[in-house]
Amino acid sequence: MAISYLTKTELDQFLHHNGNHIEASVRSALIDSLEHSGVYSDHPGDTSKAAFQSGPFGGAVPAGVQILDITQSTTVETTPNLKAIIFDDAGGKTLDVIGGHNDVFIAMGKGSDSVNLYDYGNDTVYGGSGNDAIRGGHGNSSLFGGAGNDSIYGGSGNDTLDGGSGNDYLEAGTGAQVLEGGSGNDILRDLSSGHSTLIGGDGNDTLIGVQGDVFAGGDGNDVFWVYGESGANSTLQGGNGNDTFHLQTHTGNDTIIGGAGSDTVDFADRSSFDVTKVDVDEKTNSYTLHFGDSQTVVVSGVEYLHFTDGDVHLPKL
């Protein structure tokens, strides 16, 4: 396909009127990325132009192309010049990105599409309003689902996963990653790294992680699951709502902050007789439970403890 050359204003008009109705915040992020990478200047009235290729794509990306507009499923190998890839709104496309340490910005359209990153760049992907699937690669990527019920998977780098609005599924990869569900009833899952941060946001969320992770439920009736026997320490914050914390581990020194609402901590395979000592700290409004196998759990703002032999109600301090 022929290459055209577009100023920032012409690119913005193209995104408005040529089947690429990318929301304003994503358009702004795209332009900022192109300015940061030196394609455009951030000075007012900048008339510099970017090399732009649009239409069906196949084969190697021409060396001079800086922005690629795709209209069908394809594989793209990144180059130092390629800075952005744009989807149209038709949906049903899969983009596979391969290559080295070249950073690329990907803006998906309104349809339900898939992006798979196999490269080593620190890429940025913005989903559209469809139900998108995004998979991270080997770099430190930023993956945003946007509206819709999205599925986002982290890669091997230190990625940021943001579901946006909708009922999303976020799964951490092997790096130290940040998972944020956004609004909606989301599922956040990390069973590999133990160095991730899981933030539910608004909605009734499910946060599944391992020892060493940090959990924050946000608003809504959230459910937390903590696995692993590494002995690493986790902090779990419920936020507003009636939250339930399931500790599926017998090691470590964990801290659970229930927040507003009626909250419950469930101790897997533990009876109340496994608790050998309880410390009460009225200054911090907390209870510290000591178990016979050296596990300790600090709880505050929690109303109930569930054991195999019954529930214990904790009075407010």
What name fits each language-model region?
Residues 302-305:
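Repeat-associated, polar segments at repeat-unit boundaries in modular proteins
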Residues 294-297:
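Beta-sandwich interaction modules
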Residues 1-49, 54, 75-78, 83, ...:
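GD-rich hexapeptide-repeat beta-solenoids
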Residues 112, 122, 131, 140, ...:
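Consensus positions within tandem repeat domains that build extended binding/scaffold surfaces
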Residues 57-59:
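Surface-exposed, low-complexity/disordered Ser/Thr/Gly/Pro/Asn-rich loops and linkers
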Residues 78, 87-89, 97-99, 107-108, ...:
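Glycine-centered beta-turn/loop sites at beta-strand termini
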